[in-house]
């Protein structure tokens, strides 16, 4: 990673960019801490929480969730992924189902009880963020969405 050079552009723009970087880092730290509190309160490993988030995101987008895709998303090998899925299954948060189109493939489904549990903890924050977005007009919301999408792309491809 290279540091921005003083002569690489307008210093005010660099300062604004760095303020945003620091804010994003602060939000990330707080969200991580919140996830850790959720994990501790519900006898989960932080990786289990990340796995549930990945599986919920897959369900939201309609993408099939398999142990292989989950392992890739979490950066785990097959043994590590199996351990995570086994723990979540034992706790009743996830179930394995055979794919009806390809019986060789196993799909991972999040149980409704896990969704309810997540909403009970994270729901107030989600509602606050959605309400906060009401302060911005549609053009500003589109800019925020584009910015966060670009940041996500930079993080995942960087």
Predicted regions and their residues:
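Key DNA-contact positions within bacterial/archaeal DNA-binding proteins
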Residues: 79
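Charged, amphipathic alpha-helical coiled-coil/dimerization segments
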Residues: 86-142
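C-terminal regulatory/oligomerization modules of transcriptional regulators
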Residues: 1-10, 139-158
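N-terminal leader segment of winged-helix/HTH proteins
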Residues: 1-42
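N-terminal helix-turn-helix DNA-binding core of bacterial DNA-binding proteins
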Residues: 35-76
């Amino acid at each position: 990673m290279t540091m921005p050079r003083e002569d690489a552009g307008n210093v005010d723009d660099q300062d604004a960019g760095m303020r945003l970087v620091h804010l994003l880092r602060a939000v990330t730290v707080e969200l991580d801490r919140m996830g850790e509190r959720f994990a501790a309160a519900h006898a989960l490993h932080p990786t289990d929480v990340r796995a549930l988030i990945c599986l919920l995101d897959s369900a939201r987008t309609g993408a099939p969730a398999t142990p292989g895709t989950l392992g890739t998303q979490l950066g785990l090998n097959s043994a590590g992924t199996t351990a995570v899925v086994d723990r979540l299954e034992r706790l009743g948060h996830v179930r394995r189902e055979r794919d009806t189109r390809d019986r060789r493939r196993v799909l991972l489904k999040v149980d409704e009880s896990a969704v309810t549990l997540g909403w009970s903890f994270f729901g107030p924050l989600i509602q606050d963020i959605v309400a906060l977005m009401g302060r911005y007009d549609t053009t500003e919301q589109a800019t925020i969405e584009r910015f966060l999408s670009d940041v996500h792309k930079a993080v995942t491809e960087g």
